[in-house]
């Protein structure tokens, strides 16, 4: 084994890599998380999609460590015998001492090996281990917090496993243990407390305190430096959890977060600056449709249109060919996920479309699981009526076609008055009468348990979007995960996303954001924010995100009302696009898929592991940190198909126009403005200040020559036109509705 290895630049700008290809022969990687073969939240997606890339790098020296769950093992894991004698002795030793440890292969792409620890079977040691945690780390865990108690059991079992594995190996390998989130953090703290020779990494996908604070309607990002973190955690009764998370962040050799915005948050709340940002990727191959993705969009849209026909029966007075489908999906966190600002923007969009006489209709879906007790009867009836109409039309069509065929067969033109008999007319009239309804189409597809206090329904009542015939924006709240077996909307989530036109995710708190990333790899434009990890990442890597269908909403430096105005502008501009423009934009969006592939983003994790090895084993690995400017990284240029700005265009002919007063190379008039590079640079320096976001920007023109404005346009650029009046007073909304 070489005694020293050095790190150098990889093909990815800004990241370090081994000078030679890393040889994992004498190194073992354990990735520890509560969501290994146990779907709870987004970390499950991270581990599942990243397993193939990590397995290609580490081979059979890569193991995932997670909790044993009967459901997970029965459906996702194939139990196996350990492949190495050291690992077999480790499991046998733990099982003989009262633990239950299982080994198998996770049945996902890449087929990683997993070690599953039965937390419940070790509950006999909980009180003793909680006492040891207090003696070692001064962290006390209350008896009533089951999740925290499970974290203690899981942490001690993980540490026991790693220590036993090292003891059973005669040739001590270099062990890297990567812990995800606070639920696995206890194990990291104990590894350091017991001085195990393990290189440790801790990744936080969202800080505990940050999620709680943002859910409480706090001006979070403007007060990051002012929070009394101990007091805030104590008031929310999560102080012990916060201590676990903070201790893990400080004990780790390498601390990482999933985005730059979360890194800022962690620096202030956990009091340690992350060593590296490890963005979340996707298995792009799973979503790849090559040139077929436009056809898939049309097919999926047809499935959604079938649902819309049934849902709006009796009020289907809008053209489905001129209807756009927007959606928001995710955990039901009304403010954190931006459902509040989305609803307000939809009300303003409805006003703009009505005032301007637009023929476009927008159907906005809210896919957020909530507490329900059954399907809405009106919604089920709508789908039944649609199917009945379809059956009636098919019956009449078959009779009509048979009579037409027989008439043509004898060589005569059919008598149109005899093609349909009275029975057919009666059947069609009954079908028409069935489509009549007195009430508006329902907003919610299910019966909500907390109908009167539900935040989405309460807001809809306030803004008055009741799916009336006069509304150009329709709202459908589907408080359940999508499934292809549903009697209402029988499509899975991926098919639904492909059929929509725009995903809207104006989140206030979103450490990464898989939903807009999934839209991107499927070629669907999306709206994200500069407070989400995905939005910050795309803003950093793309010169003009909006040209690629990635709209970045400013929620960090603008007020809530101004952010809502900007979102309204994005939505209205999107509605003004032609069908051809939307097709071109979807093509551009789909091109960004490779940027989100784990084959690219997995290198950030590689860099974190190399950094941890260099810190844990400095005698064998060296690491030379250095700063790299973000501008040195690759940035997607503006698409060539986007029309250039008029200010940057050039004459297409060398000959002057008749209305030009002077030749292009001739002397300038005295009253015209000369361009002085140093003077303009000085103006720019004077204009660099904290962003101020006025409600409307004003433009001034001067006579006698062109004058440059002394203000800098700090708003995000967009290749689409924005409405002249993106806002109207709330009173105007009410007057128009009345």
Swiss-Prot record:
UDP binds at residues 39, 331, 515. Its EC number is 2.4.1.11. Gene3D superfamilies: Glycogen Phosphorylase B (3.40.50.2000). It catalyses: [(1->4)-alpha-D-glucosyl](n) + UDP-alpha-D-glucose = [(1->4)-alpha-D-glucosyl](n+1) + UDP + H(+). GO terms for biological process: glycogen biosynthetic process; glycogen metabolic process; heart development. Residues 698-738 have a biased composition (Low complexity). The modification Phosphoserine is found at residues 8, 11, 412, 641, 645, 649, 652-653, 657, 672, 698, 709, 711, 728, 732. Pathway: Glycan biosynthesis; glycogen biosynthesis. Pfam families: Glycogen_syn. Phosphorylation at Ser-8 by AMPK inactivates the enzyme activity. Primed phosphorylation at Ser-657 (site 5) by CSNK2A1 and CSNK2A2 is required for inhibitory phosphorylation at Ser-641 (site 3a), Ser-645 (site 3b), Ser-649 (site 3c) and Ser-653 (site 4) by GSK3A an GSK3B. Phosphorylated at Ser-641 by PASK, leading to inactivation; phosphorylation by PASK is inhibited by glycogen. Phosphorylated at Ser-641 by DYRK2, leading to inactivation. Dephosphorylation at Ser-641 and Ser-645 by PP1 activates the enzyme. Glycogen synthase participates in the glycogen biosynthetic process along with glycogenin and glycogen branching enzyme. Extends the primer composed of a few glucose units formed by glycogenin by adding new glucose units to it. In this context, glycogen synthase transfers the glycosyl residue from UDP-Glc to the non-reducing end of alpha-1,4-glucan. Belongs to the glycosyltransferase 3 family. This is Glycogen [starch] synthase, muscle. It comes from Rattus norvegicus (Rat).
């Amino acid at each position: 084994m070489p005694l020293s290895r050095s790190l150098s630049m990889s093909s990815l700008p800004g990241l370090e890599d081994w000078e030679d290809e890393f040889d994992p022969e004498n190194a073992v990687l354990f990735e520890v998380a509560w969501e290994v073969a146990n779907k709870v939240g987004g970390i499950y997606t991270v581990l599942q999609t990243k397993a193939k890339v990590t397995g290609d790098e580490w081979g059979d020296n890569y193991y995932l460590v997670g909790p044993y769950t009967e459901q997970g093992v029965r459906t996702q894991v194939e139990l196996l015998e350990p492949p190495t004698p050291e690992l077999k002795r480790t499991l046998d030793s733990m099982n003989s001492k009262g633990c239950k440890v299982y080994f198998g292969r996770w049945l996902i792409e890449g087929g990683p090996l997993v070690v599953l620890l039965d937390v419940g079977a070790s509950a006999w040691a909980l009180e003793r281990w909680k006492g040891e945690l207090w003696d070692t780390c001064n962290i006390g865990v209350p008896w009533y917090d089951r999740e925290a108690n499970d974290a203690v059991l899981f942490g001690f079992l993980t540490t026991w496993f790693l220590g036993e594995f090292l003891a059973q190996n005669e040739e001590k390998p270099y062990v890297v243990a990567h812990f995800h989130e606070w639920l696995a953090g206890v194990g990291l703290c104990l590894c350091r407390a017991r001085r195990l020779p393990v290189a440790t990494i801790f990744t936080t996908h969202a800080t505990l305190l940050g999620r709680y604070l943002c859910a409480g309607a706090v001006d979070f990002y403007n007060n990051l430096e002012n929070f009394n973190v101990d007091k805030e955690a104590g008031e929310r009764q999560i102080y012990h959890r916060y201590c676990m998370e903070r201790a893990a962040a400080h004990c780790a050799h390498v601390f990482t977060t999933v985005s730059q915005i979360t890194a800022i948050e962690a620096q202030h709340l956990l009091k340690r600056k992350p060593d590296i940002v490890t963005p979340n990727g996707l298995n792009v191959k799973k979503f790849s449709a090559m040139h077929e993705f436009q056809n898939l969009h049309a097919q999926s849209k047809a499935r959604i249109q079938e649902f819309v026909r049934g849902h709006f029966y009796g009020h289907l007075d809008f053209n489905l060919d001129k209807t756009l489908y927007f959606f928001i999906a995710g955990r039901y966190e009304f403010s954190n996920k931006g459902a509040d600002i989305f609803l307000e923007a939809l009300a303003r969009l409805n006003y703009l479309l009505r005032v301007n006489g637009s023929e476009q209709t927008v159907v906005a879906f809210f896919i957020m699981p909530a507490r329900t007790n059954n399907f809405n009867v009106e919604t089920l009836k709508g789908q039944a009526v649609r199917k009945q109409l379809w059956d009636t039309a098919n019956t009449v069509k078959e009779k009509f076609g048979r009579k037409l065929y027989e008439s043509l067969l004898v060589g005569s033109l059919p008598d149109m008055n005899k093609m349909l008999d009275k029975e057919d007319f009666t059947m069609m009239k009954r079908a028409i009468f069935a489509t009549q309804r007195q009430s508006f189409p329902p907003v919610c597809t299910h019966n909500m348990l907390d109908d009167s206090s539900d935040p989405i329904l309460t807001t809809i009542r306030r803004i008055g979007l009741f799916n009336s015939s006069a509304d150009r924006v329709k709202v459908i709240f589907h408080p359940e995960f999508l499934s292809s077996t549903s009697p209402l909307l029988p499509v899975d989530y991926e098919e639904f996303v492909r059929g929509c036109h725009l995903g809207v995710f104006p989140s206030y708190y979103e450490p990464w954001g898989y939903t807009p990333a999934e839209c991107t790899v499927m070629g669907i434009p999306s709206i994200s924010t500069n407070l989400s990890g995905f939005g910050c990442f795309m803003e950093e890597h793309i010169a003009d995100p909006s040209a690629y269908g990635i709209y970045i909403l400013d929620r960090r430096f603008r007020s809530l009302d101004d952010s809502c105005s900007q979102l309204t502008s994005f939505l209205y501009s999107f509605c003004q696009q032609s069908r051809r423009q939307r097709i071109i934009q979807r093509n551009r969006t789909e091109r960004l898929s490779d940027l989100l592939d784990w084959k690219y983003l997995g290198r950030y994790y590689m860099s974190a592991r190399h950094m941890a090895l260099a810190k844990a084993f400095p005698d064998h690995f060296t690491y030379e940190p250095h700063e790299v400017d973000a501008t040195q990284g690759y940035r997607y240029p503006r698409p060539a198909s986007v029309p250039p700005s008029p200010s940057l265009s050039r004459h297409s002919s060398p000959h002057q126009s008749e209305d030009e007063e002077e030749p292009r190379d001739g002397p300038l008039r005295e009253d015209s403005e000369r361009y002085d590079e140093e003077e303009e640079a000085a103006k720019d320096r004077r204009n660099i200040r904290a962003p101020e976001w006025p409600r409307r920007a004003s433009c001034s023109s001067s006579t006698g020559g062109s004058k440059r404005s002394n203000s800098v346009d700090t708003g995000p650029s967009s290749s689409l036109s924005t409405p002249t009046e993106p806002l109207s007073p709330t009173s105007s909304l009410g007057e128009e509705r009345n």
